[in-house]
């Protein structure tokens, strides 16, 4: 146990030092966390053999709850409102079209099945919320045309949509699913997710304005519990927990609540640690020696997604809004 704690402390320190280095050379720090995980993995100097995917899924789910909740909490609705329509369009229809485009590519170029290709597109079609929030807030970029708000709203809301598409495709791959059942899944995911997130946030604001915590710091613990509740409650009845957490975060972040500055400092630290944990675990699970057989298809998917599918979808959806070409290219 002591050796595990020692390793944990050293990994955290190494990641923090990497943060200092990457900020100087302009590289996303999350890539450094991924690299540290790979160095600690089975093919790295430490030869740590870790393949507990169930534990990784649980830890990453918890991490995403806080990352997405705080992503919503940090959005200024006044700045985001003018671009909300475009952001929602990108995060819904945009993710679906990207997944469909990648499905076609995987089917004809890589000779996968239609559903397997669609699954690949659904998993990869959304922008990574942790990366977007990390880059925009650490670099404090002064982007024109409300692009920063557009990226934040889209990246926070497209993960729930990608999760929904992935769930539907997996259900189609593993069981016979009727059209009615599919429509109900979509309805439940969206309505329960949005509804429970909004109601929980409103009740939380009402409670915080009337209840006084006797011990300093318990308000932040309470808010962490609300973040977890915002995910768990809709999931229990078939709703989208990530969408609920995001909606709850947006509403709470734009309300006047006591000790809000303390909440920001608390979640800054928590989400920083969660991002470190997610990408370190992904690196730890990676086995570079086994990448040889899949590296070319993976690179082909990455290139087509980055330089063909995503730009085409963004262009189709944003051109009617008369979005400037530089904004479309950045998005």
Where in the sequence are the language-model features?
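Transmembrane helical cores of multi-pass secondary ion antiporters/exchangers
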Residues: 1-331
């Amino acid at each position: 146990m002591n050796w595990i704690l020692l390793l944990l402390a050293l990994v955290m320190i190494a990641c923090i030092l990497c943060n200092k280095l990457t900020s100087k050379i302009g590289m996303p720090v999350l890539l450094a966390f991924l690299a540290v995980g790979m160095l600690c993995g089975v093919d790295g100097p430490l030869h740590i053999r870790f393949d507990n995917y169930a534990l990784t899924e649980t830890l990453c789910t918890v991490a995403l709850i806080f990352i997405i909740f705080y992503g919503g909490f940090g959005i200024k609705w006044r700045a985001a409102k003018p671009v909300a329509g475009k952001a929602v369009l990108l995060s819904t229809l945009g993710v679906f079209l990207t997944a469909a485009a990648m499905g076609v590519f995987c089917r004809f170029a890589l000779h996968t099945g239609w559903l397997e290709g669609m699954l690949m597109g659904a998993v990869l079609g959304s922008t990574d919320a942790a990366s977007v929030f990390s880059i925009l807030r650490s670099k404090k970029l002064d982007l024109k045309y409300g692009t920063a708000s557009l990226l934040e709203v889209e990246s926070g809301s497209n993960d729930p949509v990608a999760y929904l598409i992935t769930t539907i495709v997996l259900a189609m791959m593993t069981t016979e699913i009727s059209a009615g059942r599919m429509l109900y899944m979509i309805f439940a995911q969206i309505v329960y997710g949005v509804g429970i997130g909004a109601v929980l946030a409103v009740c939380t604001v009402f409670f915080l304005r009337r209840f006084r915590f006797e011990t300093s710091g318990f308000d932040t613990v309470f808010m962490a519990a609300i973040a977890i509740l915002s995910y768990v409650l809709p999931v229990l009845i078939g709703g989208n927990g990530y969408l609920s957490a995001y909606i709850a975060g947006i509403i709470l972040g734009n309300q006047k609540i006591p000790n809000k500055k303390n909440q920001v400092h608390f979640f800054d630290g928590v989400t920083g640690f969660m991002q470190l944990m997610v990408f370190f675990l992904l690196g730890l699970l990676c086995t570079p020696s086994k990448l040889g057989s899949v590296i070319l298809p993976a690179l082909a998917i990455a290139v087509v997604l980055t330089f063909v599918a995503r730009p085409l979808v963004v262009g189709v959806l944003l051109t009617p809004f008369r979005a400037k070409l530089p904004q479309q290219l950045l998005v």
